[in-house]
Amino acid sequence: MAFRDQPLGELALTIPRASALFRQYDMDYCCGGKQTLARAASRKALDVAVIEAELAKLAEQPLSRDWRAAPLAEIIDHIIVRYHDRHREQLPELILQATKVERVHADKPNVPKGLTKYLTMLHQELSSHMMKEEQILFPMIKQGMGAQAGGPISVMESEHDEAGELLEVIKHITHNVTPPPEACTTWKAMYNGINEMIDDLMEHISLENNVLFPRALGGK
């Protein structure tokens, strides 16, 4: 099967650094992970053949870890340590930086107005979301009750979509997280942090939407 006919989420999981490539092209492989590469490229007016060629080069590299075959409990523990704990560190720091940048550079035309507000909204939503996963959904899955967790999983997927929408707003008001020429050190550091946070959150959502949740529902 050609890469163009495969879902983005599957490609992101099976090809090393494919997720970074999709991020480069602003293709949603987490919440939009079920769409094929061809469909995603068409929506962005991108040349799918060029992306396929880049994926073919990446596919020659060994995959560090295939989470599709890992025990569900191990996936959950990885998600908490690698993503949940990291988001809890990232967002408060980014909010502090955004507050400073918006205040100090209020008169600059390229200042990301509203960034503090939307980062705060994302922090609040994710804090509630991760707590529900850790206290309700993840214990159910670890106890082998994933097949009965359709309701909670549906809610979590809906909240993933909401987080994805907030990321789009954040990218819009930061000009795709690109610092302007006049950006100070704090401004540049903040944008580096936002890019890292977006990468982490997209990988996090992809692992849940495309691996953990389907396998839990299927009792695998």
Curated annotation (Swiss-Prot):
Keywords: Cytoplasm, Iron, Metal-binding, Stress response. It is found in: Cytoplasm. The keyword Metal-binding applies. The keyword NADP does not apply. GO terms for molecular function: metal ion binding. InterPro entries: FeS-repair_YftE, Hemerythrin-like, RIC_family. Pfam families: Hemerythrin, ScdA_N. It comes from the Bacteria. One of its GO terms (cellular component) is cytoplasm. GO terms for biological process: protein repair; response to nitrosative stress; response to oxidative stress. Transmembrane segments: none annotated. NCBIfam families: FeS_repair_RIC, PRK10992.1. Di-iron-containing protein involved in the repair of iron-sulfur clusters damaged by oxidative and nitrosative stress conditions. Homodimer. Belongs to the RIC family. YtfE subfamily. This is Iron-sulfur cluster repair protein YtfE. It comes from Klebsiella pneumoniae subsp. pneumoniae (strain ATCC 700721 / MGH 78578).
